[in-house]
UniProtKB/Swiss-Prot annotation:
The lineage of its organism: Bacteria, Pseudomonadati, Pseudomonadota, Gammaproteobacteria, Chromatiales. It is found in: Cytoplasm. It comes from Alkalilimnicola ehrlichii (strain ATCC BAA-1101 / DSM 17681 / MLHE-1). GO terms for biological process: tRNA modification. The gene is rimO. Residues 378-443 form the TRAM domain. Binds 2 [4Fe-4S] clusters. One cluster is coordinated with 3 cysteines and an exchangeable S-adenosyl-L-methionine. GO terms for molecular function: 4 iron, 4 sulfur cluster binding; aspartic acid methylthiotransferase activity; metal ion binding; protein methylthiotransferase activity. GO terms for cellular component: cytosol. Its EC number is 2.8.4.4. The keyword 4Fe-4S applies. It is an enzyme of class 2 (transferase). This is Ribosomal protein uS12 methylthiotransferase RimO. It holds the Pfam family Radical_SAM. [4Fe-4S] cluster 2 binds at C152, C156, C159.
Length: 443
């Protein structure tokens, strides 16, 4: 649970589950709670009501969310459910009939109404209501997620996100940039741009323009990245599909304006499986694009995720994926076994892959990727880079360069960090590496 100490007032416990997009939703709810004078507490027993922000992306996430709701009911008894699992109200009521209220994702007003019904907001205090301009954040002070859109226009057969969060709705570019400016003003040094499909940003608005800092800016990924670069902090892009217009970002990376880093959820490389998944692009086209990108920006770091054991996946399909990984030499990879989700079109596909085989393929893929990641990291030994410190303990520190995202990638372990502090940029020399992390010293 998230703990934020405030003045004496009605107390709300909060559980945030799921992806960074859901984390941003939690931050928005927490900010509104604090603005209205509620105290956010870290224990169930001291809360007047508990809000659980849930996930429903895969069955395991649904089970975790139901368990969290049950724990909150057992420990407190007064629970408001929100988030993606909130779209499955019948399931929640059947499993936990005692919940006070259920709302879907982004339904902030309904969450607040449910909290008000259980414990009305206190009289406002001009001093206890003060918050940083950027509101309540659940990340360390030096980095923050910047959500630029909601929903998705894709119809991937394994995914129900469009059912949960709707079609693509892009935030106006001036609002996104104003939020980014507030975050930087509050000490953020790294902006992690997120959405369900970052590369589709602005499609729904026909790339409408809005003014920021006296200059018209279009609601489009490249223009947004270019404007964010003016803030003088690291800008990292996540959830980017490899569309042709992504090519426009590479010069910004090569020039050092934004982090030379792309998080692309490719999911597979076999044309047959990609077609069954209804995913854009094929392995060969992506390989050619990666070659061009690295030619223009040699420091480019690529992260992706893949699904193995998708219905109908044969050993030949899996070999195509392994060959793609060898050729692409991606820096960081996550791999999941296929998990059926209620409402997903893939549930109707023939030839399900036995769980044992899917798990074997996952292990084989990750073993291969460990070798690839080790080779990629070894090439950085002997170089110097700027590291953003996440934690400091005496002489030792842990941080990341522009080539490592928080929470999902490896880290850089440093010596010689006396007097340094989290959130500080330091120059470092890299001296060793393994398949996940780098090791070095502060210069």
């Amino acid at each position: 649970m998230s703990a934020i100490v405030a003045a004496n007032s009605p107390r709300v416990g909060f559980v945030s589950l799921g992806c960074p997009k859901a984390l941003v939703d939690s931050e928005r709810i927490l900010t509104q709670l604090r603005v209205e004078g509620y105290e956010i507490v870290g224990g169930y027993e001291e809360a007047d009501v508990v809000v659980v922000n849930t996930c429903a992306f895969i069955e395991a996430a649904q089970a975790e969310s139901l368990d969290a709701i049950g724990e909150a009911l057992d420990e407190n008894g007064k629970v408001v459910v929100t988030g993606c699992l909130g779209t499955k109200g019948d399931l929640i009521r059947e499993t936990h009939p005692g919940v006070l209220a259920i709302t879907g994702p982004q339904d902030y007003e309904a969450v607040m109404a449910a909290v008000h019904a259980q414990c009305p907001p206190p009289a406002r205090d001009a001093f206890t209501g003060l918050l940083p301009a950027s509101g309540v954040k659940l990340t360390p002070r030096h980095y923050a997620y910047l959500k630029i859109s909601e929903g998705c226009n894709h119809h991937c057969t394994f995914c129900i996100i469009p059912q949960l969060r709707g079609r693509l709705v892009s935030r106006p570019v001036d609002q996104v940039l104003a939020e980014a400016e507030r975050l930087v003003g509050d000490g953020v040094r790294e902006l992690l741009v997120i959405s369900q499909d970052t590369s589709a940003y602005g499609v729904d608005t026909r790339y409408a323009a809005a003014e920021w800092r006296g200059v018209p800016r279009r609601t489009r990924m490249t223009e947004l990245a270019d404007a964010l670069a003016e803030l003088g902090v690291w800008v990292r892009l996540h959830y980017v599909y490899p569309y042709p217009h992504v090519d426009e970002l590479i010069p910004l990376m090569a020039e050092g304006r934004i982090a030379p880093y792309l998080d692309m959820p490719l999911q597979h490389a076999s044309p047959r499986i990609l077609k069954a998944m209804r995913r854009p692009a094929g392995g060969e086209a992506v390989l050619e694009r990666i070659r061009r990108w690295r030619q223009r920006c040699p420091d480019l770091t690529l992260r992706s995720t893949f699904i193995v054991g998708f219905p109908g996946e044969t050993e030949d399909d899996f070999q195509v994926l392994l060959e793609f990984l060898e050729a692409a030499e991606l820096d960081r990879v996550g791999c999941f076994t296929y998990s059926p989700v209620e409402g997903a079109a893939a549930n109707a596909l023939a030839d399900p892959v036995p769980e044992a085989i899917a798990e074997q393929r996952q292990a084989r893929l990750m073993a291969l990727q460990a070798e690839i990641s080790a080779r990629r990291l070894a090439r950085r030994v002997g170089t110097e880079c700027t590291v953003l410190l996440d934690a400091v303990d005496g002489d030792a520190a842990v941080g990341r360069s522009q080539l490592e995202a928080p929470e999902v990638d490896g880290v850089i372990h440093l010596r010689g960090a006396e007097g340094c502090a989290p959130g500080q940029w330091v120059p470092a020399r890299l001296e060793d590496a393994d398949e996940h992390d780098l090791y070095g010293r502060v210069l």
